[in-house]
């Protein structure tokens, strides 16, 4: 089983993934991505879905028009783990392909 990050480890990791923040009241991290339109937002979600499925680690997310809101936590570990940080970094890289920093 993957280990939950300590508060210090989580803070250090968050510094390496732009735009992500801790979720108040939960051991989770979150970010909103805003794209040009729905097609880009859906394209982003499709690409992330392939990465998430391969990693067997799936986001909590929702999409409204051009905005995708994401929450990451590792339910089995009861909080944020390296798997969440890695998926967040992958999401940032995919968003970058659409010009979203």
Curated annotation (Swiss-Prot):
EC no. given is 4.2.1.96
A Pfam family the protein falls into:
Pterin_4a
Give the matching InterPro entries.
PCD_sf (IPR036428), Pterin_deHydtase (IPR001533)
> Which CDD domains does its entry note?
PCD_DCoH_subfamily_b (cd00914)
Keyword Ribonucleoprotein listed? The answer is no
Q: Please list the GO terms describing molecular function.
A: 4-alpha-hydroxytetrahydrobiopterin dehydratase activity
Tree of life domain:
Bacteria
Mind listing the UniProt keywords for this protein, alphabetically? Lyase
Catalytic reaction equation(s): (4aS,6R)-4a-hydroxy-L-erythro-5,6,7,8-tetrahydrobiopterin = (6R)-L-erythro-6,7-dihydrobiopterin + H2O
Task: Output one GO BP term.
Answer: tetrahydrobiopterin biosynthetic process
Determine if Cell wall biogenesis/degradation is one of this entry's keywords. Answer: no
Q: What protein family does this chain belong to?
A: Belongs to the pterin-4-alpha-carbinolamine dehydratase family.
**Protein name (Swiss-Prot/TrEMBL):** Putative pterin-4-alpha-carbinolamine dehydratase
> What is the scientific name of the source organism?
Rhodopseudomonas palustris (strain HaA2)
- Taxonomic lineage of the native organism: Bacteria, Pseudomonadati, Pseudomonadota, Alphaproteobacteria, Hyphomicrobiales
